[in-house]
Amino acid sequence: DTEGANYFRYPDSSANWREIYPNGYRPISEGENRDLQIVAGARGQWGDWDYDASLDYGRNDFTYRLRNSLNASLGPGSTTRFKTGDFAFAQTVGNFDLTRVFDAAGATHTFGTGAEFRREQYRTHAGDPASYAAGPFTDRPTGSQAGGGLTPQDEADLSRNVASVYANVSSQFGDKFSTDLAGRYEHYQDFGSQWTGKLAARYAFAPAFALRGAVSNNVRAPSLSQIGYEATSTGYDAAGRLTQGRLLSVNNPIARA
C-alpha cells in the first residue's frame, strides 16, 4: 500500500471549514494495491524440436482513497474520508514456442517459431458519491479535496483479444560473424493488424572488439487504460451556476462527434 501527502489547505481557504479543521489541513492520499498471478507451463522435446507452452493469468486491482480531506461544497457536515475510485486490469496469455538447431550452408542456425493469444480486460468503478458531489454551498469547491472521485458516467469496462505469430532465426557463421532475423504478425481486436521485423548482424574482429548493427520497426498499440479512462470535474461559476468539465475517452460519442 502507498500513502502520500498533498499541499496544505489554510484555515481561511474556501476549501476548508473551520468547524472541521480549525487550523487547516493536509489531505492524505492512500493507495491499496492487490496483485494476483497464476502460471502453468510445460516444456520438452517433440522429435527434433524443443517446445515450451505456458498459460499465464495476472490481475491488478487498485483502490484510491483520501483521508483528512473534505468536500467543501457539502458544508461543515462533510465527511473527511473518501474512496475516489477502483481500477482493475487483468490479462490472460497463452503461449506456444518451438525451437530447433540445425546446420546448413556452413553455419549453425537456431530457428524458433510460435504463437500467442492474449485477453486483456480493464475496468473502473465510481468513487463514493460524496467524493464527486456538488453540494449546496456554491461558493466552495466541489468534490473531495486532493482529487475528486470518478463518477458513474466515468466508469469503463473494456476488453480485447490480441493474437500473434512470430518466427526468428539466429545464425552463427564460424567464430566471428553472426546474424539475427525475426518477424512478427500481431492482430488487435480493436486496433487492427501490424507487421514488425528485425535484422541484426555482428562481427567480432577480436575477443575484446566487435561491431554490431541492427534495423527494425516497432508499433505499440495504446493500452486499454489509455483508450478507456475518463474523469469528470464539477464546479460553480461566478454566478453560482453548476459547470462540468470532462476528460473523454477516444471512443466516447461526444469525443468522436
PLM features per residue range, with description:
Residues S159, A163, E186-T196, N218:
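Solvent-exposed loop/turn segments connecting transmembrane beta-strands
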Residues Y25-V39, Q45, Y57, S69-S178:
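Outer-membrane beta-barrel transmembrane domain signature of Gram-negative proteins
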